[in-house]
């Protein structure tokens, strides 16, 4: 027996997972501008490998408050060198102390959110 509500929930879950997908490696020579729509309480991540000496330049605006962080996984722990709550804009330069796969992550609040961000990786000189 199929329930319309179950189909709706499954569809929303698929959309939320699609919003979480990373867009692949950032080209160090090309900043990337992204426009992303987020459903209520949806997440979006953009991940990349960074090493000491690299620099991650980022900035974003959102149409509604979001939670934002830059994080990596260390075993079962999630380490967040940058974490902000309920903001509609932020920018900064993140310089990692460790070589890790880092993710920028945004989480929408209770309303749909339009997210615009720019990210650029500057690799350390050889």
Enumerate the predicted regions with their spans.
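Acidic, Ser/Thr/Pro
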Residues: 21-126
């Amino acid at each position: 027996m199929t329930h319309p509500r179950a189909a709706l929930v499954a569809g929303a879950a698929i959309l939320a997972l699609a919003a979480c997908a990373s867009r692949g490696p950032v080209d160090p020579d090309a900043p990337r501008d992204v426009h992303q729509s987020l459903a209520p309480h949806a997440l979006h991540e953009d991940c990349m490998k960074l090493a000491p000496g690299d620099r991650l330049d980022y900035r974003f605006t959102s149409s509604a408050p979001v939670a934002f962080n830059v994080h990596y996984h260390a075993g079962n722990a999630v380490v967040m060198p940058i974490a902000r709550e309920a903001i509609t804009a932020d920018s900064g330069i993140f310089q990692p102390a460790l070589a890790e796969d880092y993710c920028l992550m945004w989480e929408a609040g209770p309303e749909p959110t339009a997210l615009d961000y720019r990210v650029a990786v500057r690799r350390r000189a050889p």
